[in-house]
C-alpha cells in the first residue's frame, strides 16, 4: 500500500507525516503527488545515509528530495542521531542519521526564523551510552 492510497482514506484537511523507513524515505518523498505533499502541515522524518551526499548519486538523490520539500515546507528542527559517528569530509561534519522536522510554509507568518531555543532541552540521545552529536553550525540558519 502506498502513502497516496492511505491518504485516500484520511479525512479532508491537514495531515501529519512521520517516517523512519530506513533509507526508503527518498523514494517515497519523490513519488508523492504535489497535492498530497501540501496536505502535510508537519513532516517528521529520520533521513538515513546522509553521509552519502558526498557521492554524485547520493547528492543528486538528496538534493532532489530536499529541494522538493523546501518548496513547500521549512526546516524547523534537526536532531542528529548519535547511534553512528559523524563523517568528516571537505571540512563538513555530517551525521549519517538525522531527524528533520518540517513545517508547511503557509502555516506560519515568518518562515525565515524559528528560534533555535524553542526546542532546547527536548532532544535526547538516541543511544544514552554514546556521546551526543552536536549539530554543526553550518547546518543552522541564523536569522538576519
Cite the ranges covered by each PLM segment.
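Short, well-ordered alpha-helical microsegments
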Residues: 3, 25-27
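Switch II (G3) loop of P-loop NTPases
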Residues: 17-24
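Rossmann-like AdoMet/SAM-dependent catalytic core
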Residues: 2-13, 49-144
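Conserved acidic residues
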Residues: 1-2, 20
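A short alpha/beta connector and helix-capping loop motif
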Residues: 15, 27-64
Amino acid at each position: 500500500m502506498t502513502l497516496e492510497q492511505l491518504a485516500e482514506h484520511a479525512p479532508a484537511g491537514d495531515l501529519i507525516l512521520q517516517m523512519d523507513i530506513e533509507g526508503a524515505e527518498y523514494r517515497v518523498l519523490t513519488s508523492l503527488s504535489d497535492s498530497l505533499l501540501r496536505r502535510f502541515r508537519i513532516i517528521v522524518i529520520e533521513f538515513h545515509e546522509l553521509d552519502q551526499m558526498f557521492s554524485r548519486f547520493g547528492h543528486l538523490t538528496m538534493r532532489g528530495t530536499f529541494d522538493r520539500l523546501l518548496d513547500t515546507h521549512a526546516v524547523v528542527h534537526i536532531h542528529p542521531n548519535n547511534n553512528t559517528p559523524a563523517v568528516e569530509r571537505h571540512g563538513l561534519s555530517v551525521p549519517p542519521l538525522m531527524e528533520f522536522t518540517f513545517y508547511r510554509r503557509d502555516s506560519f507568518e515568518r518562515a525565515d526564523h524559528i528560534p533555535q531555543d524553542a526546542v532546547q532541552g527536548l532532544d535526547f540521545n538516541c543511544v544514552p551510552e554514546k556521546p551526543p552529536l552536536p549539530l554543526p553550525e553550518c547546518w543552522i540558519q541564523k536569522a538576519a
